[in-house]
């Protein structure tokens, strides 16, 4: 199965892979046709930007314009794991990933196979494996049904927690939590007491 997954990614296809939150629909981020394929599969509006799934701090530095002092500590303390970090995008981030926004989100999923595929193929997009606007399937079989068996991937239901990732915005002078997930503000402060938080804005 792994060879089939790699072949699908290589040719610009999309595959279902587990993360620590939910299953994602992964494809090569720097391949415009592959990203377009994911948008069409998910029926996702084109103005909804995508995150870059990366494998290291070096990848984050390679695609971001600003690197605040707390970035390295956040990566060391919480990644790989359920944290999305938003930074200013540099000109290496293609417009088809971040919809021409000035920022881009970074994820580093902790599933070992998913992370290894990111290392092998470079940055991948990986939005939740569902039809846009519908609930995400909680099992691999449900996801296959959602996509009429037209996708392949790796089944590992036991790895998923179903909890959201926390989204933290480092693109401004103050740090904002845009969505509270399994990593809390208190968790972050315990590791990085000096982090310059702004007022918390929870997206429910």
Question: Locations of the language-model features?
Answer:
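Active-site-adjacent structural elements in enzyme catalytic cores
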Residues: 1-204
